[in-house]
Amino acid sequence: MQLLKQLKWYFIQEYKNYTIAIFLLISISILQLYPPKLIGMLIDISIRKQTQKAPILPLILIILFISIIIYILRYMWRLFLFGASYKLAIKLRIEIYNYLCQQKNDFYLKHKTGDLIARITNDVDKVVFAAGEGVLTLVDSLIMGVSVIIVMITQISWKLTIISLIPMPIMAIIIKRFGKKLYSSYHDAQTTFSHLNNYAQENLNNIHMIKAFGLENYYSKKFLKIAHKTRKKNIKIAKIDSKFNPIIHLFISISHLLAITIGSYMITYNEISTGELMSFILYLGLIIWPMLAFAWMFNIIERGSASWDRIKSMINNNLFIHKKKYKNISNIPGILEVKINYFKYSKSNKTILKNINFKIRPGQILGICGPTGSGKSTLLKLIQRQIELYDGKISYHSIPITQFNIVEWRKKMSIVNQTTFLFSDTIANNIKLGKPYASQKEIEQATTFSDLHNDIMTFPQGYNTQVGERGIMLSGGQKQRISIARALLLKSEILILDNALSSVDNKTEINILENLKTWKKNKNTIIMCTHRLSSLINSDLIIVIENGSITQIGKHKLLIQNLKQWYGKTYLHQKLSNH
């Protein structure tokens, strides 16, 4: 029942639908009380042989009319109740998706993709089922059960009612004990399902590697092992589940046996009529649903509770919380200042960055270089707030970037990574991904800056040429230039190029770098991280990072003078290699 309390906010939000549904359920419960009474009257009339005088046909028509009304009302409550619960599914998934979009890399290191998919699909379904079927069974079982018992006591015999319901408290105690077992079993089964889902997702993503190394059988066996584990967990649930209905039917049968035995005895002493006993047995039959529903409700609620706890453990109770107030970011390009005292990843003891201090003004180009694994990519992630800095400060306009809304902060930046991603769409649509309503003139201006326009005009359909699986195959350099054009189109205040020119030739690289000089005249800041030091010649400031620390800082002309240090030595080596 704790789950229903935790979903109170949603029941209040959808109170109209739930109120109408509950009202209809109450109406149905009341209407269902009449047919057994009327059938008992018909039986007594038949036994007394008063069929000619008694209104048998009207009684039959009343029973038929009530049945039709009940059918219509059942249809209507389904629309209101399940309509409301399905809205919960949409709301939960949107909120969870938005929450996931705002998380940083640390979050995705803790939670695997398959597990997240399982929680946003399978677990949400279980919670929604509890908000729909769970509420139905709770309300219907209580109202129907109480109503029938009241009628049995007041209209037929209180003695017969008490004797017939003796097995019910025992059944309730047993159901409660099963509920606790079900909760832990469902939680374990959902966790195992998440592992299975995640394993399948990882294997499908890397199927080309599995095939390349001939590891199909090996990974199939591992998958089978996890599938068997999932099967065992579900069988455990099925075993507990399978005891529910037999126990309920056993106690219902005992109730019927007591009713018929004691009722027959009461007929002989004229305490009740045969028709009343038949009505009583029919009423007892109406209690079967509340009993089954009550047990089923525990089943549904425990499933939903286990799933809700899994969702909460993922979001750390941060869903639907009041959003923090952030400072506004000026639309005027500002100074970006980085002061990193110390940084390491949460699951590692290794220091990634330390004593990183630099400042870059609007319109300047910052070059970042250094050996592989020195911390360059981590620095870029910290600036983008993909990961959070705990010891130090990164400021823009002299305001720490943590005080800005993360979405608004990222809108200030355009990022081009070494690994490019293109949709199966036209070249134009791929370029205007971040600015869907960009004009053709704006697109062509961006491709001119990225030295791609002439290449595109050689394609059969120009900017409308399809790329991807069903289109033409582009070279690595062309893909990178589409990504650069996509970023330049946004005209963001900060442009981050992370090895973005690694696949282009020297001539194209020179053209792009010259074009960027023109592009940044609007005071755009460029941060360029690269292994190719020739790309940094025109940088206003270059920092060399080795083992997480800045070992050299200055302009290109200054840094190449010292051939004993990394920058001068590497630049000379690359220059000789090119020749």
UniProtKB/Swiss-Prot annotation:
ATP binds at residues 370-377. The chain crosses the membrane at residues 20-40, 53-73, 134-154, 155-175, 247-267, 281-301. Disulfide bonds: none annotated. Residues 18-303 form the ABC transmembrane type-1 domain. Its main location: membrane. One of its GO terms (molecular function) is ATP hydrolysis activity. Residues 338-572 form the ABC transporter domain. The keyword Zinc does not apply. It is a multi-pass membrane protein. Its EC number is 7.6.2.2. GO terms for cellular component: plasma membrane. InterPro entries: AAA+_ATPase, ABC1_TM_dom, ABC1_TM_sf, ABC_transporter-like_ATP-bd, ABC_transporter-like_CS, P-loop_NTPase, Type_1_exporter. Keywords: ATP-binding, Cell membrane, Membrane, Nucleotide-binding, Translocase, Transmembrane, Transmembrane helix, Transport. It catalyses: ATP + H2O + xenobioticSide 1 = ADP + phosphate + xenobioticSide 2. Gene3D superfamilies: ABC transporter type 1, transmembrane domain, P-loop containing nucleotide triphosphate hydrolases. It is found in: Cell membrane. SUPFAM superfamilies: ABC transporter transmembrane region (SSF90123), P-loop containing nucleoside triphosphate hydrolases (SSF52540). Belongs to the ABC transporter superfamily. Drug exporter-2 (TC 3.A.1.117) family. This is Multidrug resistance-like ATP-binding protein MdlA. It comes from Buchnera aphidicola subsp. Baizongia pistaciae (strain Bp). The gene is mdlA.
